[in-house]
Amino acid sequence: MLIDHDALKELCNSPVNKDKNGEFTQDPEAQWNVKAGSDGQRKSTYGFKAHINADEDGLITSTDYTPGNVHDSNCFTSLLDGDESAVYADSAYASEKHATWLKAHKVESRIIRRAYINKPLTTKDKQFNRLHSGTRCTVERVFGVLKLHYDTAKARYMGLNRNRTRFELMCVAHNIKRGQSIRQYSCA
């Protein structure tokens, strides 16, 4: 199973915006998220995070939707359904707690290894990352499709539950379309 997350901006993402009645337009259930951009600079966004578990065909098997300040690894075990043979994820999910959980449930860990301060990656860890990072492109592609075709890059409603419901409906639509595509090309 492939696990990943994506930060979704809240539509009215500035806490100082006020509507014509003088009330804040900021969603009180959304939170700030800080992550490194592609240029290496830290970027802050206000909104939610979407977490998905996808299989090797790109079908979404489980989702979670949280405020932006929830760390990605907090949703790890809730995304797993128990019948996985291996789990692929980025280094945000690397922890002793998760390694222990995976070992106890006899699931092979293919979580990308992370370097720490004064502890660079070994050659073996670099080879492991190179070998398994290519498989993760499937889940990244799912997020790309959700953003491009289903407009999930921004939260459209006020409130966590409304946005979660919308995201889950988009995931259902994605699975229907993806399932039809798999069926079409497997019969040919």
Predicted regions and their residues:
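Short secondary-structure boundary segments
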Residues: 91, 113-114, 141
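Feature captures the catalytic cores and cofactor-binding loops of soluble hydro-lyases/lyases
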Residues: 102-103, 115, 120
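Acidic/polar loop patches that form or flank catalytic/metal-binding clefts of enzymes
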Residues: 87-88, 110-111, 181
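Short hydrophobic/aromatic-enriched beta-strand-loop microsegments
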Residues: 105-113
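Short, charged, surface-exposed secondary-structure boundary motifs
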Residues: 74, 97, 118-125
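Short, acidic/turn-prone active-site loops that include or flank metal/cofactor-
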Residues: 67-68, 113-117
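Polybasic low-complexity intrinsically disordered regions
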Residues: 1-91, 96-104
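Basic, amphipathic alpha-helical segments enriched in Lys/Arg and hydrophobic/aromatic residues
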Residues: 125-188
